[in-house]
Amino acid sequence: MKLFAGNSNRVLAESVAQYLNIPLGKASVRRFADQEIFVEIQENVRGEDVFVLQSTSYPANDHLMELLIMIDAFRRSSARRITAVLPYFGYARQDRKPGPRTPISAKLVANLITEAGASRVLTLDLHAGQIQGFFDIPTDNLYAVPVIARDVKANYATGNCMVVSPDVGGVVRARSLAKRIDAQLAIVDKRRERPGESEVMNVIGDVSGKDCLLFDDIVDSGGTLCNAAEALLNKGANSVTAYITHGVLSGGAVARIASSKLKELVITDSIQPTTAINDAPNIRVLSISDLIGEAIARTAAEESVSSLFD
């Protein structure tokens, strides 16, 4: 087994390598003057079980091309099996046609990864579960909920917690956390007027006096979370914390979160945190390196991955 990484999240890759007690593989990923990407694998991988870790986060297109070119390089170097490890799967929000004459880009990206030569895929908290079916190769969708549940139990009196889904579509995800910490569930019903903006309409459930835990897969602009936090506090919530797997946090999201009524935003390192995120007073980062590392170890040993979440 050998683990390699592109440039998108080397800090996480190094932590995963440390968990696995193996060195991070030697590979050069660089750009020519015209910004074409060039990859050189700097050690023998013939007959090896290769894992390449790369989040296709901002800049999504560059990081996706890095991944595809790395997979091609491993295939042409006679690797026995190539597993693409995507802690964050970019383009996942384009999983259906929102209107006429529009693409399903998540399916296209799945096709590209497969055609490049990947044998299987490991990813984390896909935006929509059906994206697993976009791949024609084995695909394991991991869940951050065990990591998040441990953090909640370490920092909150769970008897007073209420897990809140920020929209109706996230109810199943929120329920999984609520079951693990034995908490009740509430829902924020919202109407999205335009991309990046949302209007909170109603809170379904009695949150009065509760420490509310918003749980979702992606935070991008932060508008939904900030509006949801305000709505919950207006309904009498004691405090509002958000637990989100993927901290995209584009544009002015960090400043928006910092000035919001959220007690804290807790994200994972599926996307490498920026300096602004690390310096933000009310944003905290949980590492999913042990979860990713254990999934890689079990995949390499042909053991069950799903039992991680039993």
From Swiss-Prot:
Signal peptide start-end: none
Residues where Mg(2+) 1 binds: H127
Subunit architecture: Homohexamer.
Stated name of the protein: Ribose-phosphate pyrophosphokinase
Species lineage: Bacteria, Pseudomonadati, Pseudomonadota, Alphaproteobacteria, Hyphomicrobiales
Annotated metabolic or biological route of this protein: Metabolic intermediate biosynthesis; 5-phospho-alpha-D-ribose 1-diphosphate biosynthesis; 5-phospho-alpha-D-ribose 1-diphosphate from D-ribose 5-phosphate (route I): step 1/1
UniProt keyword list: ATP-binding, Cytoplasm, Kinase, Magnesium, Metal-binding, Nucleotide biosynthesis, Nucleotide-binding, Transferase
Gene responsible for this protein: prs
Localization terms from the record: Cytoplasm
Residue sites binding Mg(2+) 2 per the record: D167
Residues annotated to bind D-ribose 5-phosphate: R192, D216, D220, S221, G222, G223, T224
EC number: 2.7.6.1
Catalytic activity as recorded in UniProt: D-ribose 5-phosphate + ATP = 5-phospho-alpha-D-ribose 1-diphosphate + AMP + H(+)
Keyword Cytoplasm: yes
Native source organism of the sequence: Brucella melitensis biotype 1 (strain ATCC 23456 / CCUG 17765 / NCTC 10094 / 16M)
Biological role: Involved in the biosynthesis of the central metabolite phospho-alpha-D-ribosyl-1-pyrophosphate (PRPP) via the transfer of pyrophosphoryl group from ATP to 1-hydroxyl of ribose-5-phosphate (Rib-5-P).
Enzyme class of the recorded protein, top EC level: transferase
Catalytic center residues: K190
Cofactor descriptive note: Binds 2 Mg(2+) ions per subunit.
